[in-house]
Amino acid sequence: MFFVLTFIMAFRSVNVGVDTAPYSRIFGIIHHASSFREAIELAPLSAPIYVGICRILGLFSAEPQILIIFTALFINIGLFVFINRVSSNVVISTFCWIGLTLFYCSMNGSRQSMALVITLNALVYFARDLKSKKGWILMLIAIGIHSTCLIIAVAILGIILTDKIHESRLVLIITVIISALISIVFKGIVRVLLQFFPHYSMYGFGGAQYSIFESNGGGRIVILYIFLLAICVLWTIINKKQNESDSFHSKMLPAVVFGAVFGIFNCRNELINRALWFYIGIFITFIPAVIEKCKGLVKWIIDIIIISVLAAYSLLSLLENQNGVIPYALFWQ
């Protein structure tokens, strides 16, 4: 499966993925800059490590396809390293990567997806030891590629919470309350800021077609966030206490709950939906962990529900072409 996903990503046309063409142009700007410093000044992004990667790739080829191939390898290697380290079911995790539409997103926001897979691997180290040098080095690299990964600070605070409180349901309740309060305050701040910067209202209150559910509600993606929150609740029902045999997912409980709750409150904010990729990414191994804890008929029912919901969500994303990956074309066509 690794080779299939990598092939689809690596050899796609520059027109597959909304941000693929813009990043190809940025690659050209960086490549033709006379120095690394000039490249940083000319590139319309604050990502020194990403600029450095483009400069190095430019030594081998001036064609932007080399960047597309490299990011495909980078993302998929990082993804499968993470999955193999903590997932109880590699196949289901891979399905979740596609079902949660992160695979399509990776062909759109490839730079953010690079930061995402690095951050996920950093969290594995943090779950073991918050002082992990490897974890912090990975985070610094992720920040140098896409600074939105800083939103994962909440997950780090969540690890501290689970070190203090071992009752899963209490962790759930505390996280839901804190996440809701943060969301309410955040929405208030956004409303105030939009009074001064009204041209950003399309990001704050949903200007994209796929974010609106029957043109009045909170945004259709809210259904996904509610579904993910239900999975978090199911985890706490199954694991009343922290599961020592699966300490990673026990320590990620506050993170996934925050991602779901914050998403519910801000489902019409396009920028927040994109930033929450870092939390949705944790679900690609969290969901198989929940399924594994279920037994007998319950396990089959949960399997069917999760697979059906994610398959429908993924298909709808493709039909609406939210990430610009349809029609798909190979770069030599």
Language-model features: where?
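Transmembrane-helix signature of polytopic, membrane-embedded enzymes
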Residues: 80-100
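Short acidic/glycine- and proline-prone juxtamembrane loop motifs at membrane-interface regions
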Residues: 107-113
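Alpha-helical transmembrane segments and terminal signal-anchor/GPI-anchor hydrophobic tails
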Residues: 21-24, 31, 36, 51, ...
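Signature aromatic-anchored transmembrane alpha helix within multi-pass, membrane-resident enzymes
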Residues: 172-178, 295-315
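Membrane-interface transmembrane helices that cradle and orient dolichyl/undecaprenyl
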Residues: 119-133
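Membrane-interface alpha helices of multi-pass inner-membrane proteins
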Residues: 102, 134-158, 260-264
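Transmembrane alpha-helices of multi-pass, membrane-embedded glycan-processing enzymes
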Residues: 54-58, 67-78, 283
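Short hydrophobic/aromatic helix or loop-helix immediately within or flanking a transmembrane segment
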Residues: 21-29, 36-62
